[in-house]
Structures are given as structure tokens and as C-alpha cells.
């Protein structure tokens, strides 16, 4: 703790965001980092707590409190303040192999659990300190390829090149195993590449990291649909172990009349089409699902729904409405949601901010769902019947509550519908191809990341269900240790 009074003397200062009217003109990242000296001052705000909840990563009330990767946050906060950037890079990378991802897309569980935030109302800028450290590492040449000095002679196949797959591949390669990553898409990155829009995570950031992994000896095979066009038994026969890290990509659908209308898409398919067209041709190929001049209805109030709102606005939509089943959260913590739990409070994300700037109002309508889709004579969606919901006890014995219709309904016009209602588990064909068991939740059943099939492991959302990138990285790290132990009889990961 280089400056014991830092949290009292220095105000929280974050990066500058480009104004909504300016940033919606393109799909570029829109945060302007602080100058290095100002970022160093932010490091002084860390209190080096005796019990640093920021790095705890423990479950409280069913949600994570603090960093799931157990990042050494007080250490590198102080190193930032001291200007010891080289050492800060080293200590950050001790627990997080991909800070360039988490410093952009993580919701900052660390800051929600920050003691400084609890005592002063302004948490330490942990996420932006992390971003400054990793970008310094690249700019200074510290983050370059470092292949393992020896090889074990063991080979591992990783199926899926999302955050969990990249993490498990990186750790196993560092251990000396020969790793091949199979990805069914045309680019490496999984959710990071096609599920998160470019303005949140520019794809050159992914490519920069993947190029280092390639130089370190990891082999990437794209357009390889293992369990589909690429037989699972070929992959299993060619390797000593296989890790399934295919994510939770089975989208939750809306079971309503008119669902077969044209112009209704799952959010991930919409976002994928936009990013692929951007990367392939700068949109000149015309292959992106377009929201231009359309009245857009987004079903789902989470991060993916927000990404759809921001993407549709950048495409020039005529209007955008976002439905959220749950009630509007409070603006401040309630007594039932005490620190250091994750704060269940109202958040207006970048997409909603942009909708407010462009259309003059928040796009969200709470406690609503679609009862019916309307379509015109050509079969194109042209509107939706919206049902209002309320929370009621549906099981007197347990007190379980659910959102149920109130009977109040209203109609809206829309000619593009994006379903962002979450995911129900993994797409089962990969699991079936390998013969691994699934749980009732649609995830792969496991015991310490090992499936019921010998030498076949699993990690990430495919194992734990839909979650955050930071959890996928934690899963990959922990799974790598179990795979290594299976191959070598012990592990030093």
C-alpha cells in the first residue's frame, strides 16, 4: 500500500467514452484510456485490505463476489501506483492469461466487492488498471511468444476455441503437451469473436493473442465441426486426451404463435452475421442481417440484448424496443442485497445510453414478454402482442415465485425481432458424438472436469452453463490441471 491516504485524497477517475452520437457512426471501441500518470494515481486508491474481497471469487447469494480468477489485485494496483509496470504485468499474468479480454468485457465483479467502494462509494478502477497493465505489456514488448522449453510427448485436442478452450489450451501448452484446438467457425475466438460486438471487443485484440499462442506451438484448425463433419472418433483416436469446450450455445426460444414469421432471429445469429460481414468485407458483401430503417424488437434485457440494441442503432434502425421479463431493479442496494454481494441494481449500459441519445427514451419495457407475433401476407413479422407480467407465488409449499401474465396486453409494430433470452445448455450433437452424458440442465455431466468417457474432459459454459468470460477462463485453468494430472500422474499447473 504505497499511499495509505490515497483513497481519501484521490477521486475515482475512469476512461472517457466517446459521446453516443459520435460512437454509433462505426463499430470501433469507444473508450479513451487515461494517460499513464493519471492511471498510476488511480492505483493509489487501493487500500490493500486485510481481507481483499475484490479477489475472493466466492459465491454469495448464488452470485460471484470478487474475481473468479483470484487475481492478485491489491498487488498490481500498488505496482501501478509505484510505476513498476513490468512487475505489474508479471503479477497480473500469474493468474490471468487473457487480461486483454477481461479488461474489456468483464462486468468487474472485483469492483462490486471493493472495500473502498463500500466505504467511500467509489471503488478502485480495477478493470481499467488491468487494461492499462496488459496494454503496457504489449506496447513494451513484454508479451511475446514463449514456447515451452520441453515437450512431454502427450497430445491434447481442445474442441472449441472460445475463452475456456483458449485458456485450457494455453495452460496445457505451457506444461509441454502438444495441443490442437478445433473450431467449427472460420475464425478463432468463439463467443469472443462472434458473440460480442466489435465495439466491445475489437477482433484484432483476439488475433493479437492467438498469434502469440500459435507462435508458442498451439495448432488451430478452423472450420472443423467436430461431431459433425469432423468425426469425433478421429479426434479421440489421434490424441491422448480431449477437452470439450463448446460453450452453451443452445439458444432459448420464444414459444408463441407466429414464431415462424420471417425476420425473427436469435441474437447470437444476428450478432454473428454482423461481425462476420464487418471482418470479411467492411459490410460491402451485404450478408449481415440488417436493422436499417427497421422497427426492432429485442426480447431479453441482459448483456446480449443490450449488444443487439447497440448494434441495431449502428445499423440505422428506425426504432428499438427491449423487453425484460423481470421488474425494474432498484437504483441502490436493498437490505437483502448487502455488500459484498453482486449489486442487483439498475444499470444503463452502452446500448441503452445510445438509444436514449438517439430516440429520447430508454428502450426497456419491464415485466413484459411476447404472447404472439404478427405477420403480414408475405409471412414477414410486422408486430407483436405484448403481455404484462407480475411476480406471484406459484408454489405455496415452497413459496416459489414466478412471473405470470396480468391479463393486460398491448401491441407494437416491429419488422425485425431479435431473441436474446439466454441459453439452455450446450448443443447436444458434440456430446452425443463423444458419448458423454448430459445433465438435466443441458450441460455436460462431469466429476472434476472428467466426463463419463475415459480421456474426455469438459470445461467452460459447456460444463457450468451460460456464464461470464472470466468464469470460462477460470474453468479452462482448472480443467487444464485435471487433464495434466490424468496424463502425467501429477500436475504443476
Annotated model-derived regions:
Residues 305-308, 315, 462-490:
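A conserved FAD-binding loop/helix module that cradles the flavin
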Residues 132-150, 208-229, 251-315, 438-452:
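Glycine-rich dinucleotide-binding loop and its adjacent helix/turn
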Residues 25-38, 64-65, 69-104, 108, ...:
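Ferredoxin-type iron-sulfur electron-transfer modules in oxidoreductases and energy-metabolism complexes
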Residues 150, 155-159, 207-256, 371-385, ...:
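Feature captures the FAD/FMN-dependent oxidoreductase FAD-binding
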Residues 159-163, 300-302, 461:
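Glycine-rich Rossmann-fold phosphate-binding loop(s) that bind the pyrophosphate
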Residues 12-37, 42-45, 366-368, 374-375, ...:
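C-terminal catalytic lobe of FAD-dependent flavoproteins
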Residues 260-293, 393-466:
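FAD-site-proximal beta/loop scaffold in flavoenzymes
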Residues 5-32, 41-44, 68-80, 90-92, ...:
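Beta1-alpha1 glycine-rich phosphate/pyrophosphate-binding loop at the start
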Amino acid at each position: 500500500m504505497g499511499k495509505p491516504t490515497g483513497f481519501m485524497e484521490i477521486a475515482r477517475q475512469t476512461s472517457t467514452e466517446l459521446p453516443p452520437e459520435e460512437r454509433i457512426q462505426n463499430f470501433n471501441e469507444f473508450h479513451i484510456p487515461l494517460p499513464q500518470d493519471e492511471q498510476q494515481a488511480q492505483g493509489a486508491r487501493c487500500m490493500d485490505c486485510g481481507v481483499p474481497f475484490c479477489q475472493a471469487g466466492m459465491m454469495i447469494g448464488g452470485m460471484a463476489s470478487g474475481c473468479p480468477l483470484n487475481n492478485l489485485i491489491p498487488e498490481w494496483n500498488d505496482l501501478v501506483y509505484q510505476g513498476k509496470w513490468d512487475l505489474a504485468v508479471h503479477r497480473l499474468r500469474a493468474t490471468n492469461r487473457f487480461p486483454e479480454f477481461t479488461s474489456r468485457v468483464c462486468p468487474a465483479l472485483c469492483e462490486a466487492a471493493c472495500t473502498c467502494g463500500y466505504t467511500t462509494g467509489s471503488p478502485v478502477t480495477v478493470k481499467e488498471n488491468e487494461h492499462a497493465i496488459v496494454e503496457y505489456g504489449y506496447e513494451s514488448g513484454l508479451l511475446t511468444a514463449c514456447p515451452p522449453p520441453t515437450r512431454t510427448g502427450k497430445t491434447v485436442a481442445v474442441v472449441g476455441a472460445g475463452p475456456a478452450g483458449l485458456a485450457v489450451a494455453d495452460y496445457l501448452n505451457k506444461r509441454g503437451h502438444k495441443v490442437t484446438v478445433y473450431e467449427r467457425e472460420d475464425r478463432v475466438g468463439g463467443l469472443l469473436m462472434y458473440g460480442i460486438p466489435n465495439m466491445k471487443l475489437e477482433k484484432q485484440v483476439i488475433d493479437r493473442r492467438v498469434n502469440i499462442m500459435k507462435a508458442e506451438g498451439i495448432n488451430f484448425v478452423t472450420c472443423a465441426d467436430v461431431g459433425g463433419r469432423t468425426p469425433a472418433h478421429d479426434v479421440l483416436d489421434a490424441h491422448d486426451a480431449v477437452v470439450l469446450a463448446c460453450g452453451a450455445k443452445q439458444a432459448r426460444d420464444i414459444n408463441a404463435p407466429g414464431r415462424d414469421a420471417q425476420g425473427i432471429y436469435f441474437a447470437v445469429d444476428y450478432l454473428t452475421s454482423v461481425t462476420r460481414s464487418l471482418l470479411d468485407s467492411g459490410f460491402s458483401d451485404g450478408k449481415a442481417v440488417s436493422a436499417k430503417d427497421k422497427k426492432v424488437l429485442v426480447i431479453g434485457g441482459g448483456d446480449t440484448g443490450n449488444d443487439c440494441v447497440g448494434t441495431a442503432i449502428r445499423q440505422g434502425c428506425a426504432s428499438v424496443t427491449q423487453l425484460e421479463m423481470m421488474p425494474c431493479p432498484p437504483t441502490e442496494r436493498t437490505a437483502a442485497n448487502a455488500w459484498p454481494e453482486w449489486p442487483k441494481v439498475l444499470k444503463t449500459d452502452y446500448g441503452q445510453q445510445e438509444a436514449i441519445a438517439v430516440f429520447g427514451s430508454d428502450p426497456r419495457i419491464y415485466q413484459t414478454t411476447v404472447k404472439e407475433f404478427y405477420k403480414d401476407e408475405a409471412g414477414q413479422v410486422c408486430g407483436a402482442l405484448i403481455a404484462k407480467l407480475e411476480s406471484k407465488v406459484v408454489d405455496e409449499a415452497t413459496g416459489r415465485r414466478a412471473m405470470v401474465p396480468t391479463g393486460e396486453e398491448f401491441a407494437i409494430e416491429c419488422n425485425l425481432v431479435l431473441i436474446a433470452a439466454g441459453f439452455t445448455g450446450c448443443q447436444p450433437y458434440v456430446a452425443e458424438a463423444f458419448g458423454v452424458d448430459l445433465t438435466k440442465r443441458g450441460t455436460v455431466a462431469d466429476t472434476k472436469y472428467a466426463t463419463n468417457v475415459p480421456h474426455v474432459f469438459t470445461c467452460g459454459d459447456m460444463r457450468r452453463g451460460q456464464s461470464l468470460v472470466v468464469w470460462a477462463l477460470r474453468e479452462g485453468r482448472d480443467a487444464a490441471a485435471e487433464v495434466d494430472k490424468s496424463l502425467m500422474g501429477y500436475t504443476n499447473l
